């Protein structure tokens, strides 16, 4: 079906005087299809009801003006809680629906997704939504029709005088004007169509659909839910669902009910959905059935949603756009967008309940990490043999883990350089490209620890003294070597010693012997950084500090500052 719409903002908007001297706003929509007498009858006496979608756009449903009832329809719930209605039309009628597939949205509701490439649609009419398993689907918003209208359907070579319009009435002047327009478009219609139209090969039979706006004279009828709509009765909610099951799942967000419990090794964590439990169990079993198909990428993931997020690090796709005017930022996941929106609204819904603390956070992750400061919990353990370091945050474990691998997961979008640490990438972008844009961290999506034997086989530690050879190769102790990143972003060799007793070097011809006893009786980790000008900086870090912080401290020393260990 071809729908060429002239909307209210266009220059083709016409005003026709009504019987009472009022101006009737007329919007004209052309529909090209094979004319059918029976389907023509169904168009008489129809009106439209507007419903607002999540992004502020409007969708329309058909009413039968004779009895005020909705045509057979399906209620779907969008992610912001608003309801949209899908019109079901029998196969063979002119108003045919696209094939759709039922999918579950992240809040348990159901939407229907068309099997088609989203690239075939105007991207401004495509809305990204996050599904329950973390994958992304796209809702296409069809061409919009003005609110509170009556549809009139006529043959392109016919007249409008005999049309039935239900409660509405059209004066003779309006009918005359419409007939003139019908004659005009029947002549011009074959000359070409707009860029957004699909040309119907059959020119032998046409019909014209005219939408007459009645303004406030005919009030819009409220949407009526059908027998398949299930409403949440909790105060202030009112969300609608297509099945009782989806409503029940949603109600758990109010009750806190988590009937799915993990019984793996005394874990006892509980979840609101079976899918949530299934995903969690894989953290115990290590199962990662979803593998990245990108060439030279060997990462795999627990869920298809995690894989889809990771793939965006290769493609650069960011389908979730910030709705605030003038912002223009977009994100790889709907959750990151939701947290970002709170930077506009100032919302911080997660409050620390520790007496005397009073801090609040915009994201649940930051809140959980903060609470561990009070509890002392360090649930994230490095699995590399002999390391056993523990961390309060998953991201800290990820940052630590790169010291055991050759991985450089962070890429500069300006020059293509790669880095082990996100902080080093940020420093490089600031100094080399004057880019201060925050870098999103999504380590959990693509942190895949290497097997212990691969770590031992592939990584070695080099102990650096004053040697400044042309090939950059330094004297090694214990045959282990690890390449790290210096302050200026180039690759240099650094020392990471877990214990001062394991750290010693001998003097060389190129430089004096260094003393690595930084004071104090307690044996603490030391990081020695080799910078681009040949200077070595030894940084002693505390138990809570990471290699990232050592690099930051060394950077400040390079600039002539004297930061303390706790700085």
UniProtKB/Swiss-Prot annotation:
One of its GO terms (molecular function) is DNA binding. The keyword tRNA processing does not apply. It is found in: Nucleus. SUPFAM superfamilies: beta-beta-alpha zinc fingers. Keywords: Activator, DNA-binding, Metal-binding, Nucleus, Repeat, Transcription, Transcription regulation, Zinc, Zinc-finger. A zinc finger (C2H2-type) spans 230-254, 260-284, 290-314, 320-344, 350-374, 380-404, 410-433. Residues 506-520 have a biased composition (Polar residues). Gene3D superfamilies: Classic Zinc Finger (3.30.160.60). Residues 506-525 are annotated as: Disordered. The keyword Glycosyltransferase does not apply. InterPro entries: Znf_C2H2_sf, Znf_C2H2_type. GO terms for cellular component: nucleus. PROSITE patterns: ZINC_FINGER_C2H2_1, ZINC_FINGER_C2H2_2. Pfam families: zf-C2H2. Coiled coil: none annotated. Belongs to the GLI C2H2-type zinc-finger protein family. PANTHER family: TRANSCRIPTIONAL REPRESSOR PROTEIN YY, ZINC FINGER PROTEIN 143. Transcriptional activator. Activates the gene for selenocysteine tRNA (tRNAsec). Binds to the activator element (AE) motif of the selenocysteine tRNA gene promoter. This is Zinc finger protein 143. It comes from Xenopus tropicalis.
């Amino acid at each position: 079906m071809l729908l060429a719409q002239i909307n209210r903002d266009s220059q083709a908007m016409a005003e026709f005087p009504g019987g009472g001297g009022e101006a009737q706003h007329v919007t004209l929509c052309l529909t090209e299809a094979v004319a059918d007498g029976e389907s023509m009858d169904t168009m008489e006496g129809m009106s439209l009801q507007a419903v607002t979608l999540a992004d502020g756009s409007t969708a329309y449903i058909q009413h039968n003006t004779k009895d005020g009832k909705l045509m057979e329809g399906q209620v779907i719930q969008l992610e912001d809680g608003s309801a949209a209605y899908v019109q079901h039309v029998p196969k063979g009628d002119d108003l045919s629906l696209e094939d759709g597939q039922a999918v579950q949205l992240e809040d348990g509701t159901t939407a229907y997704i068309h099997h088609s490439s989203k690239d075939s649609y105007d991207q401004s009419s495509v809305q990204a939504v996050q599904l329950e398993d973390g994958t992304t689907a796209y809702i296409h918003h069809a061409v919009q029709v003005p609110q509170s209208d009556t549809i009139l359907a006529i043959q392109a070579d016919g007249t409008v005088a005999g049309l039935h319009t239900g409660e509405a009435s059209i004066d003779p002047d309006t009918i005359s004007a419409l007939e003139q327009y019908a004659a005009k478009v029947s002549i011009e219609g074959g000359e070409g169509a707009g860029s957004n139209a699909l040309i119907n090969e059959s020119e032998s039979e046409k019909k014209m659909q005219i939408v007459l706006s009645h303004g406030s004279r005919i009030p819009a009828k409220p949407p009526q839910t059908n027998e398949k709509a299930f409403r949440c009765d909790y105060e202030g909610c009112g969300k609608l669902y297509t099945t009782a099951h989806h409503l029940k799942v949603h109600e758990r967000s109010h009750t806190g009910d988590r009937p799915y419990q993990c019984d793996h090794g005394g874990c006892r964590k509980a979840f609101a959905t079976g899918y949530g439990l299934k995903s969690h169990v894989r953290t115990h079993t290590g199962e990662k059935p979803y593998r990245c198909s990108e060439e030279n990428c060997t990462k795999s993931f627990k869920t298809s949603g995690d894989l889809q997020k990771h793939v965006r690090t290769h493609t650069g796709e960011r389908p979730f756009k910030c709705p605030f005017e003038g912002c223009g930022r977009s994100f790889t996941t709907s959750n990151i967008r939701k947290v970002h929106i709170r930077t506009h609204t100032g919302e911080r819904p997660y409050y620390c309940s520790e007496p005397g603390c009073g801090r609040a956070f915009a994201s649940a992750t930051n809140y959980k990490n903060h609470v561990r400061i009070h509890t002392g919990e360090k649930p994230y353990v490095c699995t590399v043999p002999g390391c056993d370091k523990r961390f309060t945050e998953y991201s800290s474990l990820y940052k630590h883990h790169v010291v055991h691998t050759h991985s450089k997961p962070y890429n500069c979008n300006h020059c293509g350089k790669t880095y082990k640490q996100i902080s080093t990438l940020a420093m490089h972008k600031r100094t080399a490209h004057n880019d201060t844009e925050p870098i999103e961290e999504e380590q959990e999506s693509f942190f895949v620890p290497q097997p212990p034997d691969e770590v031992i086989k592939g990584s070695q530690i080099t102990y650096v003294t004053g040697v400044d050879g042309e090939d950059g190769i330094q004297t090694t102790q214990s045959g282990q070597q690890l390449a790290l990143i210096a302050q200026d972003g180039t690759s240099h060799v650094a020392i990471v010693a877990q214990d001062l007793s394991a750290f010693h070097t001998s003097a060389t011809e190129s430089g004096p012997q260094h003393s690595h006893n930084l004071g104090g009786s307690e044996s603490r980790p030391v990081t020695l950084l080799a910078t681009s000008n040949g200077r070595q900086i030894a940084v002693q870090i505390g138990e809570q500090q990471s290699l990232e912080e050592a690099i930051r401290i060394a950077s400040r020393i390079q600039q002539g500052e004297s930061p303390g260990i706790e700085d």
